[in-house]
């Protein structure tokens, strides 16, 4: 290297830099860039990972030295182009295997690097001619090398994902410019470009470069190899290689395309030269090809055939593709990529089932990389995708146009779930079948499907592909994990947390800053404001300074600190502007100005550990707004207040941004909490007491005490389980206290506050047990008070304070006073039409209410009561009209009647509190009034049902709906019942009715005139009814006098007087129609039959998908008394005096009871009422049974028909459906829909059970959800096309209340008899698809339809989704139980008895639940709770909304993930989560399957000591199919879909008992198995023994309620995370086709293939013999091989003639004819070899015909003679032996001879060289010849043949065919032809040596060893 001139370097750098540059220039890969003179140096290329090459390539290779250039760039000149990727990588320094960390920015066609990003000078590399590849096969250290014509760099990334990102970025940087630059086109270009994919590797034999044809350097032939086509090149030659890699599409085939005459394209061979595998055989000449001395011969990349250069022209043109032809997508079939990013495919001829392969390259210690490359070599490279780099979407998009294809996922269970999720996204379930190759750790799904637990060897991949081709298909159930998370209000410190001193100090700083921000926004005291402002500035200053100490070089952190300083200054500016008006000139302004002038250091700070963001986010939005109202004492304008609050929010977010950026590696669960919504950034706390702030406010400060107090231990939450309160002992009182999900305006219910700050304050009830609700109304914007004229009202000046002892507070009335301009915080979520409509509706309703109030005779009583309330809140009652309030009916809870709380328009009934002698299992119920009210407000509190008054005749439907008051018709989950929502004024449940029933039915319903307080049902021992009846009449007359009034409730004081009367037995009023309150003495209860109740069904956690409304239509039952009706004709709504009683049955028949007796008291009066109003009064399907009543018209029996989903356009006006007659039975029967409503009703009362939680029903529409529809009001949930499709799509939609009942008991005595007649019971079912029939069923339930319109009940057998399946109220389960079980279980239980079928009805609960060690939840139901669902369908069918499980179960939830294998919560998820964290921290420790199992064992043992998930049963609740399951002490719950858990454990256990109540577990039965986990010891023991005592249930849906405020670990298919409190539902999502291994089919196919191969071998033998015959038939010359057979034939004939003649001579008594035959045979034999010489030419074959005929005759006659006379012959022993051998040889030789007639008509003889298997001498000697002759039959001969023995003696007698069979048994059939050509018999086989085998073509070392060992075994035997 003396020729190098170092003085030619002219780099203007420091001497150190110059010396480093000089040294670097001597080493090729270390050269950089810059303006530097080119220096010729010797390239030194090495890869440190392989460690194989210690010398440079130039020392071995003879090519001249290359010129390497080094260039440098200045930083300022490199800022012109955009940076594609930048980051730090490790760069190899080529000295002592060292690595240096360097900063690399990548731009288009240029790569730069320097020590760090702040360097001014960068080395640059031109990437215009780039070659990059991975280093090594498995590439453990994630290194890759880039080679250009001038540079070579080895770089190392931190992870394989980062390495893939860099390689992808290099593709992007070097790819040509495209108009569309998305990732799909980049990957598409990579697929279609035919570029090689290099990786560095070594070789075991000499290998040659395909570019320069020279040998690769080094002893191990180290170089680059293409992972697809195995092209070998030098590293220096990689950039010069042409793009001739394996074809992918038709375009890549190019000029090699072969097109036939018919236009079809033939798949040609794709040849690669040289480097053939060992022992390659030419496909043409069958000789060895390839060489280790040079690059010669060819191999096809598709069919793997090898040929010589000279034989290649003789090769067939069409390529057979190879053994994997069924799975390969030929490149000639893929024509192009269409506009939808999918292939345009032309299916090839023949069988075609393409295979799409996804490989996780990280799986199995990077074993996936080997499989990825192997698959690309076997298949089309465009069929194989790496999940790490491209994901599943690219491959699925490309394969979208295939009709059917298979998917092979080579990874663990997590990647399988990823692929299945993408299949869901593309909706490709029907066209793909998924198989799994186990490369992960657990591989549970692969175990269940039969593919084994692991697959580590890629050498047998072709055989594995054949297994997947013969696989069978099964359906895998997939389950949606739906979660409903609740916010955690107060964060709790982890139990075992170790905090550093610095972390605690920074946490205190952030907490202090948050408190000061609250004081600044909240306080009205000047001194407090000054102090808080100064402390805030000091705290922020200290925080920034401390963080900047450890992060001095972080520019981004410095920017965030600067933003924090600016936002703090903006806050001070806003505070100065705010206080300028009221406090001008005081010291506050001076202090603020001084603080603004101060400068906060800009230096970025160090990081603290992640602080919990919920320190100041624990309050709800309503507290924020209420606190803002209490701050009105400073008389600030609204805009200034909002500006100040926004500035405070900005400062708070800036503080969190600084802290978050200072520690980028914090857990994701905390980063999720840092996402602060705009209305949740600063939730200001309110004062907990009644004391006001130092600065007095004109408004009282209402204490924000929730009805659900966090301090009350006995309170109960609103649970979602339909179970009594006593079953929920572990419920957290804060559950769902802060749920508030914002919804977009397209989905938001306008009655709910989806993100709107709530203003309803909740007051804890005092000791008097009485709460009063004031009627209020809130403005439409939620922030301004508007009077009747639309002007903004001024704040009230009256002030007052509330003391904690004054409990009687109007807590629903909170006036809101704001400034001029107000920006609605939800303007983006609410349509503009809402504001206009609600504003005018509010103003009109205010005017109407003022007129009504003036005419109200009891207004003085109301004022008196209002004044009582005003004493507490200091607000005059007369100002209530002018205050923005919320319309809420009053409620007075009286402690006189236990569990019943009534008022003028609402009755609250505690359904769970036990009033009977049956005590609850909970000790917390009863006693304090606050406890009762706490339970009432959250569980039992229901609002008055809506009442329709009679409208004016001239009103239209729009007027009716627009003028409907919210107090008349109330949503079940409306603001009046929810402590979390507020209502928009003017809206009512009419919107929901319109959305469900349509405007026609809504208009028809309004004809009913229903009163509010008519007592219709009470105790049988009724008290004096006159006083309440008079009040009822007065209320009714007042209602008729004011038809415009929507609220028909009577005066409150009258109602209170009636409700407070202790001697009034009818105080329950209308409530008893729906509920029977058991509040009487025991003897009275024993005398009376039980009354059964109904319940308005809530969907768990939701509001029944927008369709919840409460309008009960009640039926009258026949009574024995005479006081049945009191006013039948005086008014349109007759009032019934006596109470109705439901038909009573025994308790066993209770669940099946459906009939209600409806009696028509006066037919004529009823008909007159019907004629006066043609509209139906209700939408109701009812049921009665035939009864008889004296003195009245004929009784009518009505059958309850279940509700059917309706389309709005299918509902017809009732007047047009049926003519009406003025009298007669037919007219009554045809118009009896009017009878159903011709009676007075009390205030509708619906019990709100504890299972009905308020929720948010968020409806997600289709892609056209944003499109406007004609006549669509955005504020009304009307029947738009989405709703219509929703109402009619699902056949499972129903209004049945008992769908989720826990009290379903099967009653097999249900009568299904039909009776016919005009007024007889007619029981029929309305078919779902028939909407016209459904309309008739709902609107006219008593119309006698023709028999042909009645569907057959037997048709329910085939309908799984029928409305009646699963409900015992209609008793249809027994019709289809067997068929249903057969359909769902695949017929696996078809042999079960009916009793067993009944016991196996899902859910199947473990009987161990009833044992004493399990908690008892079955005794806490109570009488009322059991009665609620008895006749729920019958009573509530009219008002029960259409509940579609497909819709309502998902409302308010979001899909977290999809479960394929199993779901775990508790200890198993904790172990998986710990392992996941360990793998993320130390991936090098978790690279092998065995090591991962070890880690699982260690972590499981850790949980054995720590018991982190102890007492999990107190933190979760479990429900299976809606039934609450009691839980013992456990640490986890596992829900299984497949019988394999966490690495092959059968956690459910195998069923061995015949009387097992559970179904056999399967993954295709739509059934889940629920298992309890008691500890890690049980999990370990379940791997060894069969455990079953931990089984819980089998069900079809699971719900888990997570209580408390702590997160619980959860895992799905091995992927774990921490789940916050809330609800989790596991529902069936769909099914996917999975490929299962079919071993029986594999065996059958293998045997069939073996037979086919044997048959092909025999055909080849025949063909070869026939070919030889035809080849010799032209010249009639006997070949050498035939001559050898001829000599044996002559020897056999001569021997037989000799011994037959000797036999005749020895026994003269034998026939002499045989001697003559022998003589003729001898003469014929002499004729073919006259004078000892064989004839030549065609005459020989002609003469041989005569010899064969005579020899066959001699053989036959000799055999016949010996068979006939053999028993009497006495032969010498030697003669016997010789004669037997002669006959046997003659028989064998005759089989080789054949006589054929030629074209010229002459007969010629031919010899078959490949004769059939012959019997060896050893077998012949075992039995004398004549004994075999005496057997007389061939069957006998075959029966006595001994088996072939592998002894040396037997082997020496083997023929060629037996040797061939021996080879085939050793699976060496490729050498059969060679052994046949060389005529290797048994004797020759035993003497074969290694050299002989080589001459026979056996060159593989393994095959040679196997053959030699087998020969040795034969010789030894």
Swiss-Prot record:
Biased composition (Polar residues): 1128-1145
Renumbered residue ranges of the record's region Disordered: 1-37, 1015-1053, 1114-1149, 1380-1399
Cited Gene3D superfamilies: 2.60.200.40, 3.30.60.20, Pleckstrin-homology domain (PH domain)/Phosphotyrosine-binding domain (PTB), Probable inorganic polyphosphate/atp-NAD kinase, domain 1, Transcription Factor, Ets-1
GO biological process: glycerolipid metabolic process; phospholipase C-activating G protein-coupled receptor signaling pathway
Subcellular compartments: Cytoplasm
Ranges annotated as biased composition (Low complexity): 23-37
Zinc finger (Phorbol-ester/DAG-type): 195-245, 268-319
Domain spans labelled PH: 82-175
Composition-biased stretches (Basic and acidic residues): 1-10
InterPro entries assigned: ATP-NAD_kinase_N (IPR017438), C1-like_sf (IPR046349), DGK (IPR037607), DGKD_4H (IPR054474), Diacylglycerol_kin_accessory (IPR000756), Diacylglycerol_kinase_cat_dom (IPR001206), NAD/diacylglycerol_kinase_sf (IPR016064), PE/DAG-bd (IPR002219)
One Pfam assignment: C1_1
Domain DAGKc intervals: 350-486
Family stated for the protein in its record: Belongs to the eukaryotic diacylglycerol kinase family.
The name this protein goes by in its record: Diacylglycerol kinase eta
């Amino acid at each position: 290297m003396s020729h190098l001139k170092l003085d030619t370097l002219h780099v203007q750098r420091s001497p150190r830099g110059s010396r480093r540059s000089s040294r670097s220039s001597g080493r090729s890969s270390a050269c950089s860039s810059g303006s530097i003179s080119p220096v010729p140096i010797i390239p030194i290329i090495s890869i440190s990972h392989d460690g194989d090459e210690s010398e440079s390539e130039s020392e071995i290779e003879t090519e001249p030295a290359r010129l390497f250039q080094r260039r440098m760039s200045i930083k300022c000149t490199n800022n012109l182009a955009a940076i594609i990727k930048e980051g730090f990588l490790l760069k190899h320094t080529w000295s002592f295997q060292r690595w240096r960390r360097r900063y690399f920015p990548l731009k288009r066609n240029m790569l730069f690097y320097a020590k760090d990003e702040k360097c001014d000078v960068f080395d640059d590399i031109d990437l215009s001619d780039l070659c990059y590849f991975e280093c090594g096969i498995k590439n453990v250290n994630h290194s890759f090398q880039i080679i250009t014509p001038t540079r070579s760099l080895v770089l190392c990334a931190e992870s394989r994902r980062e390495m893939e990102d860099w390689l992808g970025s290099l593709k992007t940087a070097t790819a040509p410019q495209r108009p569309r630059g998305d990732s799909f086109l980049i990957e598409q270009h990579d697929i279609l470009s035919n570029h090689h994919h290099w990786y560095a590797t070594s070789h075991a034999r000499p290998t040659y470069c395909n570019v320069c044809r020279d040998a690769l350097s080094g002893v191990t032939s180290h170089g680059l190899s293409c992972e697809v086509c195995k092209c070998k090149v030098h590293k220096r030659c990689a950039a010069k290689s042409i793009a001739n890699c394996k074809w992918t599409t038709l375009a890549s085939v190019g000029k090699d395309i072969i097109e036939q005459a018919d236009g079809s394209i033939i798949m040609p061979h794709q040849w690669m030269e040289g480097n053939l595998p060992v022992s390659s055989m030419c496909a043409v000449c069958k000789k060895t090809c390839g060489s280790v001395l040079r690059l010669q011969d060819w191999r096809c990349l598709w069919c793997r055939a090898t040929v010589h250069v000279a034989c290649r022209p003789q090769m067939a043109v069409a390529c057979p593709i190879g053994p994997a032809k069924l799975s390969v997508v030929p490149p000639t079939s893929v024509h192009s990529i269409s506009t939808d990013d999918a292939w345009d495919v032309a299916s090839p001829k023949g069988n075609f089932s393409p295979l799409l392969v996804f490989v996780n390259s990280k799986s199995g210690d990077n074993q996936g990389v080997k499989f990825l490359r192997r698959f690309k070599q076997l298949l089309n490279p465009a069929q194989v995708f790496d999940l790490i780099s491209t994901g599943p979407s690219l491959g699925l998009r490309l394969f979208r146009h295939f009709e059917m294809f298979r998917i092979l996922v080579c990874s663990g269970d997590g990647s399988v779930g990823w692929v299945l999720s993408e299949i869901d996204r593309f909706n490709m379930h029907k066209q793909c079948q998924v198989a799994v190759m186990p490369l992960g750790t657990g591989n549970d799904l692969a175990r269940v499907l039969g593919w084994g637990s692991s697959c580590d060897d890629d050498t047998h991949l072709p055989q594995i592909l054949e297994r997947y081709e013969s696989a069978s298909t099964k359906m895998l159930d997939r389950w949606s994990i739906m979660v409903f998370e609740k916010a955690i209000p107060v964060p709790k410190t982890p139990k075992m947390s170790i905090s550093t001193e610095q972390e605690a100090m920074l946490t205190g700083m952030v907490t202090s800053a948050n408190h000061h921000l609250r004081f600044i926004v909240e306080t009205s005291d000047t001194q407090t404001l000054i102090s808080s402002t100064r402390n805030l500035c000091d705290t922020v200053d200290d925080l920034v300074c401390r963080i900047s100490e450890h992060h001095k070089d972080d520019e981004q952190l410095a920017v965030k600190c600067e933003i924090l300083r600016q936002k703090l200054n903006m806050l001070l500016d806003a505070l100065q502007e705010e206080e300028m008006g009221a406090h001008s000139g005081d010291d506050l302004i001076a202090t603020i100005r001084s603080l603004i002038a101060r400068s906060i250091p800009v230096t970025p700070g160090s990081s603290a550990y992640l602080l919990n963001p919920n320190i100041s986010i624990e309050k709800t939005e309503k507290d924020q707004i209420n606190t803002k109202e209490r701050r009105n004492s400073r008389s600030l304008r609204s805009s200034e207040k909002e500006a100040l609050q926004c500035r405070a929010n900005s400062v708070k977010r800036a503080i969190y941004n600084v802290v978050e950026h200072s520690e980028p590696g914090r857990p994701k669960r905390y980063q999720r909490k840092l996402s602060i919504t705009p209305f949740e950034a600063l939730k200001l706390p309110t004062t907990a007491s009644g004391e006001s702030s130092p600065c007095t406010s004109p408004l009282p400060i209402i204490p924000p005490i929730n009805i659900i107090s966090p301090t009350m231990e006995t309170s109960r939450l609103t649970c979602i389980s339909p179970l009594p309160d006593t079953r929920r002992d572990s419920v957290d009182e804060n559950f769902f206290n802060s749920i508030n999900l914002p919804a977009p305006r397209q989905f938001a219910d306008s009655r709910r506050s989806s993100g709107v700050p709530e203003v309803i304050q909740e007051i804890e009830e005092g000791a008097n047990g009485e709460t009063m609700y004031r009627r209020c109304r809130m403005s439409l914007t939620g922030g301004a008070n508007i009077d009747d004229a639309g002007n903004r009202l001024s704040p009230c000046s009256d002030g007052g304070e509330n003391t904690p002892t004054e409990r009687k507070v109007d807590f629903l009335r909170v006036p809101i006073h704001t400034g001029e301009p107000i920006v609605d915080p939800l303007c983006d979520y609410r349509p503009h039409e809402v504001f206009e409509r609600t504003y005018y509706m509010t103003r009109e309703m205010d005017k109407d209410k003022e007129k009504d109030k003036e005419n109200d005779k009891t207004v003085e009583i109301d004022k008196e009561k209002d004044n009582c309330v005003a004493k507490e809140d200091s607000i005059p009652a007369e100002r209530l009209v002018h205050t923005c309030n919320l319309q809420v009916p009053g409620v007075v809870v009286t402690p006189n009647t236990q569990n019943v709380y009534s008022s003028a328009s609402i009755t609250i009934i505690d359904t769970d509190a036990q009033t009977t002698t049956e005590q609850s299992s909970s000790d917390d119920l009863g006693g304090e009034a606050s406890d009762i009210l706490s339970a009432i407000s959250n569980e039992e509190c229901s609002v008055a049902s809506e009442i329709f008054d009679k409208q004016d005749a001239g009103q239209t439907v729009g007027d009716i709906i627009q003028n409907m008051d919210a107090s008349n018709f109330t949503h079940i989950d409306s603001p009046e019942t929810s402590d979390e929502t507020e209502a928009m004024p003017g809206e009512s449940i009419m919107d929901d009715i319109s959305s469900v029933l349509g405007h026609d039915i809504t208009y028809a319903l309004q004809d009913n005139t229903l009163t509010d307080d008519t007592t219709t049902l009470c105790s049988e021992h009724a008290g004096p009814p006159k006083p309440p009846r008079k009040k009822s009449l007065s209320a009714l007359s007042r209602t008729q006098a004011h038809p415009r009034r929507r609220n028909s409730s009577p005066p409150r004081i009258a109602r209170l007087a009636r409700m407070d009367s202790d001697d009034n037995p009818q105080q329950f009023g209308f409530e008893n129609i729906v509920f029977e309150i058991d509040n009487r003495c025991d003897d009275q209860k024993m005398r009376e039959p039980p009354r059964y109740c109904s319940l308005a069904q809530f969907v768990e956690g939701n509001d029944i998908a927008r369709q919840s409304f409460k309008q009960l239509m009640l039926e009258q039952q026949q009574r024995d008394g005479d006081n049945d009706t009191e006013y039948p004709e005086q008014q349109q709504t007759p009032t019934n005096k006596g109470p109705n009683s439901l038909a009573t049955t025994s308790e066993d028949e209770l669940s099946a009871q459906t009939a209600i007796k409806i009696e028509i008291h006066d037919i004529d009066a009823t008909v007159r009422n019907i004629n006066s109003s043609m509209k139906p009064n209700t939408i109701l399907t009812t049921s009665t049974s035939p009864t008889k009543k004296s003195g009245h018209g004929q009784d009518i029996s009505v059958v309850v028909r279940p509700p059917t989903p309706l389309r709005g356009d299918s509902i017809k006006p009732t007047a047009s459906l049926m003519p009406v007659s003025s009298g007669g039975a037919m007219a009554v029967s045809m118009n009896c829909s009017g009878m159903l409503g011709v009676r007075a009703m009390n205030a509708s009362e619906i019990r709100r059970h504890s299972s009905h939680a308020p929720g948010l029903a968020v409806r997600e529409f289709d892609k056209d959800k944003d499109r406007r529809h004609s006549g669509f009001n955005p504020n009304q949930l009307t029947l738009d096309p989405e709703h219509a499709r929703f109402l009619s799509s699902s056949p499972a939609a129903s209004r049945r209340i008992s769908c989720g009942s826990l009290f379903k008991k099967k009653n097999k005595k249900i009568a299904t008899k039909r009776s016919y007649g005009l007024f007889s019971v007619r029981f029929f079912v309305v078919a779902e698809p028939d909407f016209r029939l459904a309309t008739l069923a709902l609107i006219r339930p008593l119309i006698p339809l023709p028999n042909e319109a009645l569907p057959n009940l037997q048709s329910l057998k085939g309908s799984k989704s029928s409305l009646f399946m699963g409900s015992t109220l209609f008793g249809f389960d027994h019709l289809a139980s067997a068929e249903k079980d057969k359909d769902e279980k695949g017929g696996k239980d078809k042999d079960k008895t009916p009793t067993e079928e009944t016991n196996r009805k899902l859910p199947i609960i473990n009987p161990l639940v009833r044992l004493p060690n399990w908690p008892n939840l079955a005794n806490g139901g109570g009488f009322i709770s059991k009665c609620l669902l008895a006749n729920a369908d019958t009573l509530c069918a009219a008002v029960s909304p259409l509940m579609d499980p497909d819709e309502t179960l998902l409302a308010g939830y979001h899909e977290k993930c999809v479960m394929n294998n199993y779901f775990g919560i508790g200890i198993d998820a904790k172990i998986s989560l710990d392992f996941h964290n360990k793998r993320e921290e130390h991936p090098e420790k978790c690279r092998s399957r065995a090591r991962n199992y070890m880690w699982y064992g260690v972590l499981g043992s850790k949980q054995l000591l720590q018991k982190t998930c102890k007492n999990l049963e107190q933190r979760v609740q479990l429900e299976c199919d809606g039934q609450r399951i009691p839980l013992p002490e456990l640490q986890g719950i596992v829900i299984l879909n497949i019988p394999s858990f966490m690495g092959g454990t059968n956690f459910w256990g195998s069923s061995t008992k015949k009387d097992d109540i559970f179904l056999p577990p399967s993954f295709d039965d739509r059934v889940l198995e629920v298992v309890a986990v008691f500890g890690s010891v049980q999990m370990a023991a379940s791997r060894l023994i069969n455990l079953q005592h931990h089984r819980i249930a089998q069900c079809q849906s699971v719900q888990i309620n997570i209580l408390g405020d702590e997160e619980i670990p959860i895992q799905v298919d091995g992927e774990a995370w921490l789940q916050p409190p809330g609800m989790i539902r596991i529902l069936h999502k769909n099914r996917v086709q999975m490929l299962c291994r079919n071993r029986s089919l594999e065996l059958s196919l293998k045997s069939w293939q073996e037979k086919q191969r044997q048959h092909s071998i025999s055909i080849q033998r025949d063909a070869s013999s026939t070919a030889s015959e035809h080849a010799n038939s032209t010249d009639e010359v006997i070949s050498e091989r035939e001559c050898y057979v001829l000599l044996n034939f002559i020897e056999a004939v001569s021997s037989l003639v000799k011994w037959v003649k000797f036999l005749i001579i020895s026994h003269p008594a034998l026939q002499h004819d045989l001697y003559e035959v022998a003589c003729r045979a001898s003469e014929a034999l002499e004729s073919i070899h006259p004078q000892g010489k064989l004839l030549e030419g065609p005459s020989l074959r002609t003469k041989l015909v005569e010899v064969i005929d005579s020899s066959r005759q001699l053989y036959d006659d000799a055999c016949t003679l010996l068979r006939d006379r053999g028993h009497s012959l006495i032969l010498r022993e030697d003669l016997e032996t010789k004669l037997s051998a002669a006959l046997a040889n003659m028989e064998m030789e005759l089989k080789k001879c054949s006589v054929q007639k030629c074209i010229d008509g002459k007969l010629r003889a031919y010899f078959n060289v490949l004769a059939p298997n012959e019997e060896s001498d050893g077998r012949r000697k075992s039995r004398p010849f004549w004994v075999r002759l005496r057997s007389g039959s061939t069957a006998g001969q075959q029966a006595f043949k001994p088996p072939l023995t592998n002894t040396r003696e037997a082997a020496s007698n083997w023929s060629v065919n037996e040797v061939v069979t021996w080879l085939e048994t050793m699976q060496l059939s490729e050498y059969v032809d060679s052994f046949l050509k060389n005529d290797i018999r048994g004797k020759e086989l035993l003497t074969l040596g290694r050299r002989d085998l080589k001459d026979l073509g056996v060159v593989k070392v393994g095959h040679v060893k196997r053959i030699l060992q087998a020969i040795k075994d034969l010789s030894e035997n």
